[in-house]
Amino acid sequence: MAETNPELSDLMAQTNKKIVPKFTEIFPVEDVNYPYSAFIASVRKDVIKHCTDHKGIFQPVLPPEKKVPELWFYTELKTRTSSITLAIRMDNLYLVGFRTPGGVWWEFGKAGDTHLLGDNPRWLGFGGRYQDLIGNKGLETVTMGRAEMTRAVNDLAKKKKMATLEEEEVQMQMQMPEAAELAAAAAAADPQADTKSKLVKLVVMVCEGLRFNTVSRTVDAGFNSQHGVTLTVTQGKQVQKWDRISKAAFEWADHPTAVIPDMQKLGIKDKNEAARIVALVKNQTTAAAAAATAASADNDDDEA
């Protein structure tokens, strides 16, 4: 008899498992009396309850990352006319998907992938990496702010189906006589571009705002600006290296004076500078190692 793959079994079970978030934070996006900074501070405070302290690391360390996430939280972004709920992993602060007012969950990924969300989610048709969302552009090209978040929420809340390139071409063929020429032009376009643009704004403002002190401060400073706000080129590069900065924090915990070349390229010379930039550190221990440590502690009465 073939042995079952525990990870695969867990993933399959997750498909039918209803997520119970540890908390839900509501942000009234258009309320100018409710600062973005207060929203981020409140979510961070709740996330930190599930973090641990690590000797030599100034920042709270997130729970160990697992193949099948166990800890989740929701953020409900509400405008005057609509709302969406973001499902975010506690172990790495990744946005996995969002729920519309109609109760439909949209998840990053495509047919053939394994769902992490319950309640019969639908695939967005693309992944959640920055490469998937903005291609080779830098994060300094992403405009954010209260108005941008409002538009993103209102537009995403209306999403009812995944627009595919084929669907776009068929619609044009039915509506316009010069369809052949237009369809050829459409083939070079991305019918999901607008959805991706809205989602990347929310990913940076919410997820990166939680991870990075620099991001939350920058966004907060220009959140009410009519022209929006953007990150600097350096901040954008740091955001895309959050995992590596987290690894460096663990390295500096063991070797405080270590010189880490790739951190110097990001303008981060030591753990003090890293703590100024990063608010929450990704756990660098594997789930297996964490389980082994826990088992060892359970079997040893002298363990603290």
Curated annotation (Swiss-Prot):
<comment type="subunit">
    <text>Monomer.</text>
</comment>
<dbReference type="GO" id="GO:0090729">
    <property type="term" value="F:toxin activity"/>
</dbReference>
<dbReference type="Pfam" id="PF00161">
    <property type="entry name" value="RIP"/>
</dbReference>
<dbReference type="InterPro" id="IPR016138">
    <property type="entry name" value="Ribosome_inactivat_prot_sub1"/>
</dbReference>
<protein>
    <recommendedName>
        <fullName>Ribosome-inactivating protein 9</fullName>
        <ecNumber>3.2.2.22</ecNumber>
    </recommendedName>
</protein>
<keyword id="KW-0963">Cytoplasm</keyword>
<dbReference type="InterPro" id="IPR017989">
    <property type="entry name" value="Ribosome_inactivat_1/2"/>
</dbReference>
<feature type="active site">
    <location>
        <position position="208"/>
    </location>
</feature>
<keyword id="KW-0800">Toxin</keyword>
<keyword id="KW-0611">Plant defense</keyword>
<dbReference type="InterPro" id="IPR001574">
    <property type="entry name" value="Ribosome_inactivat_prot"/>
</dbReference>
<dbReference type="GO" id="GO:0005737">
    <property type="term" value="C:cytoplasm"/>
</dbReference>
<dbReference type="GO" id="GO:0030598">
    <property type="term" value="F:rRNA N-glycosylase activity"/>
</dbReference>
<comment type="similarity">
    <text>Belongs to the ribosome-inactivating protein family. Type 1 RIP subfamily.</text>
</comment>
<dbReference type="InterPro" id="IPR036041">
    <property type="entry name" value="Ribosome-inact_prot_sf"/>
</dbReference>
<comment type="function">
    <text>Possesses features of some constitutive defense agent. The coordinate Opaque-2-controlled synthesis of this protein and the major seed storage proteins (zeins) may provide the germinating seedling with both nutritional benefits and protection against pathogen invasion of the surrounding endosperm.</text>
</comment>
<keyword id="KW-0652">Protein synthesis inhibitor</keyword>
<dbReference type="InterPro" id="IPR017988">
    <property type="entry name" value="Ribosome_inactivat_prot_CS"/>
</dbReference>
<keyword id="KW-0378">Hydrolase</keyword>
<dbReference type="InterPro" id="IPR016139">
    <property type="entry name" value="Ribosome_inactivat_prot_sub2"/>
</dbReference>
<dbReference type="GO" id="GO:0006952">
    <property type="term" value="P:defense response"/>
</dbReference>
<dbReference type="GO" id="GO:0017148">
    <property type="term" value="P:negative regulation of translation"/>
</dbReference>
